[in-house]
């Protein structure tokens, strides 16, 4: 390992530990009462503009090896940092609003802390490898994604968050990412990271994905490169989707709600003046048993009929082959038995003709 790689690994590990420490601290401190949850749940955007309290972001908090003082000036030993991290400063954006979002989606602080903050629960990022300044870390249980974002994306999220907050409560089945928290951390003097905690779109490890499609509805430059294709679970793009003649089958029960939700989500993106977004589609090749269960669950009768037809045709083919084999045996037996009989008849008639001719000659 080179010195540079070693330094990057140490920095990445320090970042992971800092994030875990920060998330645990903030999530355990922010509590949403039943009254607050009912008060702000379902608020429209105009109503939320008068409730700036829930979108308030507090100043940076300093975490040291000896602990520190919280935002109320009280001594807090939980602010003592891990020895691998050292001193750092951090902040959480709109803690009350994000706490309401988490509760709205059925998350508790304890469940998130358990997934994110345990030892070895977060994969260290490959610093410097992210496109457009973005990096991803996944929790070991596949429930959450931590995305390190550039400053410009942080500004956009801060700007659109009130609209997002209102929209997800009106559309709980939305397909857009679920943002559970946004933070900033500065573990060293010359480094600063902004990150969001999101839901993992493909959390179930029982259904491993053979490949994924990142679809934008555009064809220009939308083809996976060789490096991406060689990955264990490659992510293909629009041109690959067309070239592979891929299809997405949605059952009749889900098709109309799905289309309506996509239209609503696209309308939200337009309202937010966002154009760089895509639909991520995961593909898992079903086994025969999984296919039967999926067809029943989604109400897809077409695939089931096709499957039955295949089985029926296979049975008919085997039955026809069996009948054909029987016919061949019968024909063969006819040939073996019938031909000598024919010869016998012919020889018998010849003998009769010879006797009759001899009798005529004697006369």
What are these regions (language model features)?
Residues 1-363:
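Polybasic, positively charged surfaces/segments
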């Amino acid at each position: 390992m080179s010195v540079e790689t070693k330094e990057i690994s140490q920095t990445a590990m320090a970042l992971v530990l800092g994030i875990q420490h920060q998330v645990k601290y903030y999530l355990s401190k922010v509590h949403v009462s039943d009254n607050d949850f009912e008060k702000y749940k379902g608020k429209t955007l105009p109503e939320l503009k008068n409730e700036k309290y829930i979108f308030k972001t507090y100043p940076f908090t300093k975490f040291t090896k000896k602990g520190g003082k919280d935002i109320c000036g009280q001594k807090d030993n939980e602010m003592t940092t891990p020895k691998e991290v050292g001193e750092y400063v951090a902040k959480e954006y709109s803690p009350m609003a994000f706490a309401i979002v988490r509760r709205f989606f059925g998350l508790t602080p304890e469940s998130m802390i358990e997934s994110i903050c345990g030892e070895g629960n977060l994969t260290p990022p490959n610093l410097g490898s992210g496109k457009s300044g973005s990096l991803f870390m996944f929790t070991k249980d596949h429930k959450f994604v931590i995305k390190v974002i550039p400053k410009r994306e942080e500004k956009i999220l801060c700007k659109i968050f009130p609209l997002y907050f209102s929209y997800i409560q009106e559309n709980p089945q939305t397909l857009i990412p679920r943002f559970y928290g946004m933070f900033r951390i500065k573990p060293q003097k010359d480094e600063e990271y902004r990150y969001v905690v999101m839901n993992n779109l493909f959390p179930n490890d029982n259904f491993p994905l053979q490949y994924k499609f990142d679809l934008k509805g555009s064809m220009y430059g939308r083809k996976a490169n060789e490096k991406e294709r060689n990955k264990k679970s490659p992510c293909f793009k629009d041109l690959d989707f067309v070239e592979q003649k891929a299809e997405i089958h949605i059952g009749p029960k889900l098709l109309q709600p799905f289309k309506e939700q996509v239209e609503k989500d696209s309308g939200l993106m337009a309202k937010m003046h966002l154009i760089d977004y895509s639909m991520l589609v995961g593909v898992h090749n079903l086994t025969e048993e999984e296919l039967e269960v999926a067809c029943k669950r989604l109400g897809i009768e077409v695939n089931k009929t096709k499957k039955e037809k295949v089985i029926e045709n296979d049975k008919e083919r085997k039955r026809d082959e069996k009948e054909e084999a029987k016919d061949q045996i019968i024909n063969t037996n006819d040939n073996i038995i019938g031909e000598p009989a024919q010869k016998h008849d012919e020889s018998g008639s010849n003998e009769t003709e010879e006797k009759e001719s001899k009798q005529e000659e004697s006369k």
